[in-house]
Regions:
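Surface-exposed, low-hydrophobicity beta-strand/loop segments enriched in small/polar/acidic residues
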Residues: 1-197
């Protein structure tokens, strides 16, 4: 039996939710969903000038792997001048962003980045490109970050481009807990596309 397969390419965008401007109170989001099929990223906040470390941001939305369909609110402390800070949660959808402690000192931009988190799915295949430096692709479950479920190394000394199809049903990204998720981490990888289903 063949299930639907979708492709996903990890990315980042530092002003996906909010372009560079001074923010007060609840802001109007430019977009809300950074990826398809329930995947997501940590939300990033960067200020271009001034110290915002005394400012808190309340970020609400749906996190990756939450099958209960309830929103989560995370309070994120702002950073110093030109510093990017990230949420702890991986958000599949952001529904609200508010400045909790007054107006930010400098202009801020709100986006996403870092590792990508995948909901319960199966990795069927992938292709990647890498530079001459040694690199790796590592997939771990959120409840066990020390034991990867998939680890691919890219050798040093050559420009690498590779495609691999995983046999049978592929690699399941989560364990017995349906609310688990998997984290895909890249080191010295130029681009990666995962085929899941």
């Amino acid at each position: 039996m063949q299930s639907d397969v979708f492709a996903i390419t990890p990315s980042s965008d530092n002003n996906f939710y909010f372009a560079s401007a001074t923010a007060t109170g609840t802001i109007s989001l430019l977009k809300s969903t950074p990826s398809r099929n329930g995947a997501g990223y940590k939300v990033s906040v960067q200020n271009s000038a001034g110290d915002d470390s005394s400012t808190n941001y309340n970020i609400s939305g749906f996190v990756v792997g939450d099958l209960g369909a309830s929103t989560v609110t995370e309070t994120l402390a702002g950073g110093e001048s030109a510093v990017t800070v990230f949420t702890t949660n991986y958000f599949a959808e952001v529904t609200n962003f508010a400045v909790a402690a007054g107006t930010s000192v400098g202009t801020i931009q709100v986006g996403y980045g870092g590792d990508i988190a995948l909901p319960r799915t199966r990795i069927k295949a992938f292709n990647y490109a890498a530079p001459t430096a040694a690199g790796s692709i590592t997939v771990t479950r959120d409840d066990n970050s020390t034991l990867p479920i998939l680890e691919i190394t890219s050798p040093a000394g050559i420009v690498e481009s590779s495609h691999l199809t995983i046999p049978e049903n592929g690699i399941l990204t989560t364990g017995s807990n349906n609310n688990n998720y998997a984290i895909v981490s890249l080191t010295n990888i130029t681009s990666l596309t995962l085929y899941c289903g």
